[in-house]
Amino acid sequence: MTLQECYRQIGGDYNAAIDRFKNESTLERFVLMFPSDQSMSLLHTGIEIGNISLSFRSVHSLKGVAANLSFTDLQQKASALTEQLRYRSEQPDAELLDAVERSYKATVGAISEYKASKA
């Protein structure tokens, strides 16, 4: 699997990412670090303990990382959840959260598949 194929699989914008990072080796380094980002874990923690502020900050960070890496599908889904939580008045909408979780899992799965294909 190529990095471009990985991006296609997750609904990302490979060309925008290359424009931002200037070359594939730099982009690859950051893509491979993405699964270790703690934003999704912190989002779940915030939900579990009922801390809407933590949930908001976590999904906002996830949205930003996804945007910087041009993971378009994940960024859009995280953005919708971010806006729902922005005013910190309610727990995350279950459908929005599910969409973020599915996109996140697909993204991490594709990155793992890409990494395995390089070994």
Predicted region positions:
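Intrinsically disordered or compositionally simple regulatory linkers and C-terminal tails
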Residues: 1-5
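Long, amphipathic alpha-helical coiled-coil segments characteristic
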Residues: 11-61, 92-115
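Short, well-ordered alpha-helical segments
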Residues: 39, 51, 55-58, 66-86, ...
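Alpha-helix N-cap/helix-start motif at coil-to-helix transitions, marked by capping-box chemistry
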Residues: 8, 32-34, 72-75
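Conserved catalytic segment of histidine kinase HATPase_c domains, centered on the N-box/ATP-lid region
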Residues: 87-91
